[in-house]
Amino acid sequence: MEGLGIVFLAAVVLLFVFLFFSFIPVGLWISAWAAGVRVPLLTLVAMRLRRVPPAKIIYPLIKATKAGLDVRLDRLEAHYLAGGNVDRVVDALIAADKAGIKLTFDRAAAIDLAGRDVLEAVRVSVNPKVIQTPMVAAVAKDGIQLLATARVTVRANIDRLVGGAGEETIIARVGEGIVTTIGSANSHKEVLENPDRISKTVLEKGLDAGTAFEILSVDIADVDVGKNIGAQLQIDQAEADKKIAQAKAEERRAMAVAAEQENRALVEAMRAKLVEAQAQVPLALAEALRKGHLGVMDYYRLKNIEADTDMRESISRAAKPEGEE
């Protein structure tokens, strides 16, 4: 029984020691003291109770202390609880301090909480970044299209990282400047001969205003000749004018056909009236003979004239060439 009691007691002691060292990061506390960072053991226990991993706070604090930065433990913990990346902020502060860039903890924390990569921003401040613009198409006044690409060298502006526009805005503004410069040129040859004209115009516009970057230089990487847009527009206009003229001609033809049909209908109507009038002639003659207004000799003289007229018409029709009506 005594042996079982000793075994049970040893198991309890081992369990207590295991729980003690798992809940209280003694190893981390020793590492901090060895690095010259004085952190009370109760502070580490309090972090556990606040569900803050002590390692995510202590290791960045050790790096900051070794780099000669004065960073307080409670501020690192507050930044972690706010959802920030403590390790990246400390790395950015160390990089800025070594590069001689003025960057406070509050500024770095604000940049990190704004969703920016503060460490990358410090690196871009030290080593400027080159942004390659996509192919930009623009048309000079002579109608020739030019295709240009540019390389924009930028440096991060730490003071404007919070609330400043990003790379997309820089690319869009540079593209706008390229289009404006090419569009204002009287000839595409002017741009081909002096591509630095685009760079000067873009830099003079102050395109980095309101952005998180400072434009150092704009270099035209390539300028190619595209389509003859002016000639293509003239061809399209001529084709459109041709179609309009054809439509108007078709309209006039349709109107002429309609007028011809109307005239034919009018002729037929006149012929009908003529036939109707001719049908009234015998009746009028009979009425004249009945009333004595026309004598018999006058009637026969009229018939002779009518026969003579019919004969002349027959002779004239016979004298016409074959095929002629």
From Swiss-Prot:
Q: Does the keyword Transmembrane apply?
A: yes
UniProt topology in membrane: Multi-pass membrane protein
| Membrane spanning stretches | 4-24, 26-46
GO CC annotation: membrane raft; plasma membrane
Please give the superkingdom of this protein's source: Bacteria
Q: Which InterPro entries match?
A: FloA (IPR022853)
Which keywords does UniProt give here?
Answer: Cell membrane, Membrane, Transmembrane, Transmembrane helix
The family database entries (NCBIfam families) matched by this protein are listed as: PRK13665.1
Quaternary structure and interacting proteins, as annotated: Homooligomerizes.
In UniProt terms, what function does this protein have?
Found in functional membrane microdomains (FMM) that may be equivalent to eukaryotic membrane rafts. FMMs are highly dynamic and increase in number as cells age. Flotillins are thought to be important factors in membrane fluidity.
Report what the protein is called.
Answer: Flotillin-like protein FloA
Task: Please tell me the species this chain comes from.
Answer: Thermus thermophilus (strain ATCC 27634 / DSM 579 / HB8)
